[in-house]
Curated annotation (Swiss-Prot):
Organism of derivation: Bacillus subtilis (strain 168)
Domain of life: Bacteria
Lineage: Bacteria, Bacillati, Bacillota, Bacilli, Bacillales
PROSITE patterns: HTH_LYSR
InterPro entries, alphabetized: LysR_subst-bd, Tscrpt_reg_HTH_LysR, WH-like_DNA-bd_sf, WH_DNA-bd_sf
GO annotation (BP), single: regulation of DNA-templated transcription
Record-stated family: Belongs to the LysR transcriptional regulatory family.
Keywords assigned by UniProt, alphabetized: Activator, Amino-acid biosynthesis, DNA-binding, Glutamate biosynthesis, Repressor, Transcription, Transcription regulation
Designated name of the protein: HTH-type transcriptional regulator GltR
Length: 296
């Protein structure tokens, strides 16, 4: 099976469009179409449905996506192993929730980057579910997510615990009970965010659903709109502490049974521990004072 054909197929499947895949690969659209047809002929099956809105994967195509990811990842690992030296170098892609990246990672990443300048370190931010899928599909070497989670293909290490608080404008009255938010507009991240899932769990437990939600893409927008009195939000205390100190917003504690969430670092069990990743894991454990998984 031709590796280039698999790369073209997987890119097309991820982009969901031949034209977008062509742009990503810097190919002509006709070249992408021809390579997909060649792969379909080799496998004697249709991999995509063609329709007026574009393309979608057939059942055999969905199966091939998983195999293609594994094959291409194994080839990348083999190349890395062949060129490997004891000094950390090469690409390292780490994912993180936006809030974790903003508060907890700057010093860690800066120190790591100074120690290992030959590592091509790349940080990708996004909600927890997006990070999990990226790790599972070999797009990231590891990621900081909200957890814990259970998945047979993942290894996880607890990094820290975060206290969650309700956040309002500075002039907002004290919130003494979660019931007080029933008439408020809740400002949340897009679906897939663990803090939004946490809020939904709390509201469901307290019998407060449905409630009005307003969705935002970035943290700064939520904090700005909370400060202006547009609504309230549920966020880690660490991320809003400086804004509260400036008098822009006000935090309100919630019940202990809801108030803490754990940040975990996940990676695939079968991922190759390159010198770059090994050094990152060691540096991360030292930074957050984490015991190795094999230590008691």
């Amino acid at each position: 099976m031709n590796i280039q054909l698999l790369q073209v197929f997987l890119t097309t499947a991820r982009e969901g469009s031949i034209s977008k895949a062509a742009l990503t690969l810097n190919y002509a659209q006709s070249n992408v179409t021809n390579k997909i047809q060649q792969l379909e002929n080799d496998l004697q099956t249709k991999l995509f449905y063609r329709h007026s809105r574009g393309i979608t994967l057939t059942p055999p195509g969905q199966i091939l996506v998983s195999y293609s990811e594994k094959i291409l990842h194994t080839i990348e690992e083999a190349r890395a192993a062949m060129g490997e030296s004891s000094a950390p170098s090469g690409p390292l892609r780490i994912g993180s929730m936006e809030t974790t990246a903003a508060v907890w990672l700057p010093q860690l990443l800066a120190h790591y980057n100074n120690l290992y300048p030959n590592v091509d370190l790349n940080l990708v931010t996004g909600p927890t579910e997006q990070q999990i899928q990226a790790v599972l599909h070999y797009e990231l070497n590891g990621a900081f997510i909200s957890g814990p989670i259970e998945h047979p293909d993942l290894v996880q290490e607890k990094v820290l615990d975060e206290e969650m608080v309700l956040v309002t404008s500075a002039s907002h009255p004290v919130i003494s009970s979660i019931q007080d938010v029933q008439t408020q507009t809740m400002l949340v991240f897009r679906k897939g965010c663990s803090y939004r899932a946490k809020l939904n769990h709390i509201l469901q437990e307290e019998g407060l659903l449905p409630i009005k939600l307003m969705e935002f893409g970035i943290l700064e927008a939520i904090i700005g709109c909370v400060s202006a009195g547009l609504g309230i939000s549920l966020l880690p205390r660490s991320i809003i502490a400086s804004h509260e100190k400036e008098g822009r917003i006000r935090s309100h504690t919630i019940s202990d049974k809801y108030s803490f969430v754990s940040t975990m670092f996940i990676r695939r069990k079968d991922t190759l521990i390159t010198p770059a990743l090994s050094a990152f894991l060691t540096h991360m454990r030292d930074h957050f004072q984490i015991k190795r998984p094999d230590q008691s």
